[in-house]
Curated annotation (Swiss-Prot):
GO cellular component, one term: cytosolic large ribosomal subunit
Keyword rRNA-binding found: yes
Key words of the record: Ribonucleoprotein, Ribosomal protein, RNA-binding, rRNA-binding
Protein function: One of the primary rRNA binding proteins, it binds directly near the 3'-end of the 23S rRNA, where it nucleates assembly of the 50S subunit.
Disulphide bridges: none
Name recorded for this polypeptide: Large ribosomal subunit protein uL3
Classification via PROSITE patterns: RIBOSOMAL_L3
Region of interest (Disordered), ranges: 122-155
Record gene name: rplC
Family, per entry: Belongs to the universal ribosomal protein uL3 family.
InterPro entries the record matches: Ribosomal_uL3, Ribosomal_uL3_bac/org-type, Ribosomal_uL3_CS, Transl_B-barrel_sf
GO biological process, one term: translation
NAD among keywords: no
GO molecular function: rRNA binding; structural constituent of ribosome
């Protein structure tokens, strides 16, 4: 598995290809990330690197985390993430990982947190149909039956009902990188990704099978 990168979602826009066709893209501020730990098979049982992103004031972090970051001479970083690799020999503590590790046309997966929409009903959360809106009906947006009677005498686990919508970890797979701005560390990815502008995202090379 190749190394990914942490970044923030900046928003969406559109660019035009050679034929003049508009392509909707999401702009991601990708890195720069600092390698804060290198894991090897001898010391940890597997190969991986840990990267940090999002510089903050030192007082925002606790002392154990500041001590961990000091080993790589990294500044105070808010977010840490680990990426598995086939070999960690190509990476060193304090190394910078930037947007240029990706290329145009590359297929990637984007991991983020979906926008939280609070408590939502069945129509919005589960795409249920509604009841009649006229002719004396009082069942407009009610959930309807949630089970039988005495048997089974309970509501089955997993029954789709009203509840909190969004705010969950989401992975959007097999998106295409349309453009890489190595100078400004920007990635332009075709399509939408989870989260609102400013949200933390992780971009990793996709596992394309076949």
């Amino acid at each position: 598995m190749s190394v990914g990168i942490l970044g923030t979602k900046l928003g969406m826009t559109q660019i035009f290809d050679e034929a003049g066709v508009a392509i909707p893209v999401t702009v991601i501020q990708a890195g720069p990330c600092t390698v804060t730990q290198v894991k090897t098979k001898q010391t940890d049982g597997y190969f991986a690197i840990q990267v940090g992103f999002g510089e903050v004031k030192p007082k925002a972090l606790n002392r154990p985390l500041l001590g961990h970051l000091a080993k790589s001479s990294a500044p105070a970083l808010r977010h840490l993430n680990e990426y598995h690799t086939d070999s960690s020999s190509d990476y060193a503590l304090g190394q910078q990982i930037k947007a240029d590790i990706f290329s145009e046309g590359q297929i990637v997966d984007v991991v983020g947190t979906s926008i939280g929409r609070g408590f939502a009903g069945n129509q919005k959360r589960n795409n249920f149909g509604r009841g009649p809106m006229s002719h004396g009906s009082k069942n407009h947006r009610a959930p309807g039956s949630i089970g039988a009677g005495t048997t089974p005498g309970r509501v089955y686990p997993g029954k789709r009902m009203a509840g909190r919508l969004g705010g969950k970890r989401i992975t959007i797979r097999k998106l295409t990188i349309v453009r890489v701005d190595a100078e400004r560390n920007l990635l332009l990815i075709k399509g939408a990704i989870p989260g609102k502008p400013g949200a933390l995202v992780s971009v990793v090379p996709a596992k394309v099978v076949g």
